[in-house]
Amino acid sequence: MMNYYNDRDSKLIPGKLDGTWWEGGSMFMILIQYWFLTGDTQFNSAVQEGMYWQKGDDDFFPTNYSQYLGNDDQVFWGLAAITAAELNFPEKDGQPSWVSLAQGVFNTQVPRWDTSSCQGGLRWQIWPYQDGYGTKNAISNGGLFQLSARLALYTGNHTYAQWAERIWDWSATTPLLKEKNWNIADSTTTEANCKDHGDWQWTYNYATYISGAAYMYNYVRHSFPFFFFLFFSSVSLSPSSRIFHSPHSIPSTCTDH
């Protein structure tokens, strides 16, 4: 992974991967966890440089990419920042704290909560000229749900928990989170008042909601709805291997993105 990062065409832009922006946040989140679990510090400077370079106005919404980013793109960097805060990843003098960067993402996404359609929810993409503006998807809403839950647990501020519950409750009124069978649809559209759904199944959608539910379960001291979800989501795991399979994954096929 680091060989690819160091050899990329965009290597003069710290934190930017070729052809994609959000995956840089995902990569740094993995490297932060790697440092925490192994004690290996060799990648820490690259993580710090990339995270701070892409922080924009302390909200991971840099002007160079803001015209085409989606809410899901931004939230991955917020999740990387809250991971750094939780694991006490080293900060650099003169730079904002990791938790403040995670809060910056939360503070810019909450005003985008859209009650003009579907009685709530985050749109996938932010600007009306983007193709995904009419879509409300699981990873954007699940991402903000998880970030809110983690900020609640980390800071003790109940406002974050209230937002996590609001996102959960709204998701459950749409195909994005079906409490009857715990199916998580990839997307729904404002044109259909969020009653239709995209049938694609992606494991990161499930993982985002499951992780957020686990943080909320800890925050509210074993709340029944979140326990219920955590218990039944385990049914989706393969009994033989305990691996969560994505029905639409293609075996042995990988790309840079």
Each model region followed by its residue ranges:
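Glycan-recognition and catalytic cores of secretory/periplasmic carbohydrate-active enzymes
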Residues: 1-257
